Amino acid sequence: MPDVTRQETATRHPLLTRQNTIINDFKGYEKLYMIGGNSGWANMNALIRRSIDDVRLYDERDWKSPQVDVWGISDLDLFKESDRILRALPADKPFFAYVQTAGNHRPFTIPKDNDGFQVSDKTVEQVQAAGSRSVEQYNAVRLLDFNIGRLMELAKAGGYYENTIFVLFGDHNTRISQIPHMAPAFEQLGLESNNVPLLIHAPGLLGTRVVDEAVGLADLLPTLAGMAGMDFTSGTMGRDIQQAAPEGERVVPLVLREGTFPLIGGVTRNYLLQMEHDGSSPTLHDLSSPTPLDNVAEQNPQEFERLRDLTPGLHETSRMMLYQNVR
């Protein structure tokens, strides 16, 4: 569900770390969580251990590889050691594994042992024109792409590539620079931090598809359960994106300004409705417009009315579910 807490993050709240999760509906699966550094960051280990039944959690204390920076071992070493763990599992038992990378996060470390990855010698002007803030960041993103390729090679060599659904996503974005190929709305309406990549890769199982609706990370677990053919019960906000949304065109709730008095939003493929947390000052914005700050509520009264009702409902339901979903 969306984290709509108004102080810190939900994982830091000791009463919210024991949540019902669809992961527990993956009956008969080995469940693993691997992170290159300290799993105690933001109290994540409490959430993982208390919410996921029989989970095997691996962090910096379990790895043989050297730490390269504050985030622990390198992503490449994390992939290699995780691959060895997955290969050692019983061949007839499925697994649900979460591998948390950190290499494209500051300080953008390029480890010495990187399987031949070549740093690109670009100028600051060149990388900033393409959307990166620094040469270091540019090469860190390139390294992440390289490492994902190595992960796929390891999975193929390990014999589990063809029967595995790989999910690649970012937990959040960050302001980098103004990017010409992105619509002005992402910068001017503050959507860049919420706009993250999401790739589901299983060519032998799923084929190919582009989802052009607005979807959120809360939709990820029910979607994966649907793809795996699992029966599941959800007490949270996520929906299987393979199924039609009951509200018609799908709406994703957002928090656009955090804090005690947040600015909340409901985003669709084409529009963003934003309002104060108490429902006041609602405005509707066209995401494809060259002037996205314009309020287009009068030109689109039906969509404005639909989102004006849904947005606070989704936000307040998310707040309630953080407590109602506790096991």
Specify the residue positions occupied by each region the protein language model found:
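Solvent-exposed soluble domains appended to multi-pass membrane proteins
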Residues: 1-327
